[in-house]
């Protein structure tokens, strides 16, 4: 085991896959000598050169299109968005090309690529740089989405994503890059379509992902002190959802709370609600409650920024309300 920060775990995973497979390359802005805006690609340019680590101009639509074309020929590009919000400039390429080409070509082409980068609220980056694009990408046919939350799952997921035949949107949170954890030195993979049972419990199922995993864990300490027994699941796979793990939990607890940083309208929480109501309605003893960010542009002011995002105290209040519902 060795202690790694989350960004170091991602770096190590990418390094191993470039070493393992000559078809893997990285493309994006400032990923070369600079090492990426959050140092995820640090040291890769020096080792692999400019044919494997491609520094680009500020032109998201162009370098994303280049990467998709490369994927169509059998290469495995890793596209880094300096910020997830910037990838809106490449939405046409990601949606109409990467997501749909396998279908629209009658199976003649695949687009094995990873689109990754930082996003989320918490560093006073303003509205444009605090985007959470889960709601944008989840409606695009052909795309898979995962969100890492620990150094362990970050490394295992990025390796699995690079090896996948599908286009993967890989969400990283700006506030999680410096999370520390001991991870195995021996190679391992984390499945792309599997949720993680973070804590076993019997009274309520709390579904969450990314940064909100830590807000939920903080809230769980208070709930446990009050005598409650919450079950916590990090869904990890945002598309497709791991309904098997979710179903097993809800058939035990019969109560569910969804906690996300994505905005309420059209977010992952809305999709989860729909999926649960369609397949698990008979197992619910209470209405589903979902806690999401407010439908407002993220303020620059730090105090106001915090007000837009769900806090641990709100999770405690909501969980108690559901557990005591009659």
Curated annotation (Swiss-Prot):
Full protein name: Pyruvate dehydrogenase E1 component subunit beta
GO MF entries: metal ion binding; pyruvate dehydrogenase (acetyl-transferring) activity
Organism: Chara vulgaris (Common stonewort)
Annotated localization: Plastid, Chloroplast
Role this protein plays: The pyruvate dehydrogenase complex catalyzes the overall conversion of pyruvate to acetyl-CoA and CO(2). It contains multiple copies of three enzymatic components: pyruvate dehydrogenase (E1), dihydrolipoamide acetyltransferase (E2) and lipoamide dehydrogenase (E3).
Top-level class of the enzyme under EC nomenclature: oxidoreductase
Binding-site residues, K(+): 113, 161-162, 166
Cofactor(s) of this protein: thiamine diphosphate
